[in-house]
Amino acid sequence: LIPIEVNIMKIKAVVFDAYGTLFDVYSIQVLAEAFYPGNGADIAAKWRDKQIEYTRLITQSDPHNATGSRFFRPFWELTRLSLEYTLDRLALDRKSGQVEKLMQQYAHLTPFPENLAVLQQIKAMGLTTAILSNGSVEMLTSAVKSAGMADVLDHLLSVDPIRLFKTSPESYGLVQQNMAVNKDEVLFVSSNGWDVLGATWFGFTTHWVNRQGLPFEALSPQPHFSGPDLHSVLHSLGTISNPPIPNQI
């Protein structure tokens, strides 16, 4: 654990990122490989990178508009455009039927296996649970229902109302706007280093789910907590007594 002073006993809500944290964005490569043999992993990686690049471009190009970025497009639309670009970049045929099937698969991404048990334990502690995501409410609702997690998540928060994506301060501010909590009462959980940085800068206590065993970003600050999967969130909350997880920061 990083020796940053934080009172974990003040935590009232645990807020999760969705894509990459609760849902495996790279699970799409199985279907992509079936459609485009030898290209599945490359499609999944480039698709995800372009998707995030588009969100940053939109937010950074018009960050001070009171009604959100005038360039804003819903995450679902950006996901489709990112897929189309990826296929074009790899010189692969954009057959409409295959694009539609990949998009539908994205709406029902594979959840990580520990999700439900961990969320149930967090709820049993009396804590509020939520998702904060670039995804639309419709996307999140579909993914959560298909994963059987609707009963263990109290809030599904989308950036759509503010028309600014993460890591804008306004995106993290949605937590306080929609939940009766202060910044220091929130544990924010994400597998994306850039998301953890944004949330830490905003003032949340943060937990980085380091599923790939990577070094954290060179840019500071470091996350308050880290571990290899969602079970480590329980460790951070003090609900289990285990020795330090080997690949914690």
Regions found by a protein language model. Give the residues of each.
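A metal-dependent, Asp-based hydrolase signature
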Residues: 41, 49, 54-100
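Short, acidic loop-to-helix structural element flanking the phosphoryl-transfer center
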Residues: 72, 76-80, 92-131, 141, ...
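Short, Lys/Arg-enriched N-terminal segments with co-localized hydrophobic residues
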Residues: 1-8
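A short acidic, helix-capping loop that chelates divalent metal ions and anchors anionic groups
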Residues: 31, 54-60, 139-141, 215-218
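Asp-based, Mg2+/Mn2+-dependent phosphohydrolase catalytic module
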Residues: 9-14, 120, 132, 136-249
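Alpha-helical elements of Rossmann-like donor-binding domains used by nucleotide-donor carbohydrate transfer enzymes
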Residues: 30-31, 46, 81-85, 101, ...
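Active-site neighborhood of HAD-like aspartate-dependent phosphohydrolases
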Residues: 9-52
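Short helix-capping segments at alpha-helix termini
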Residues: 36-40, 89-94, 124, 148-152, ...
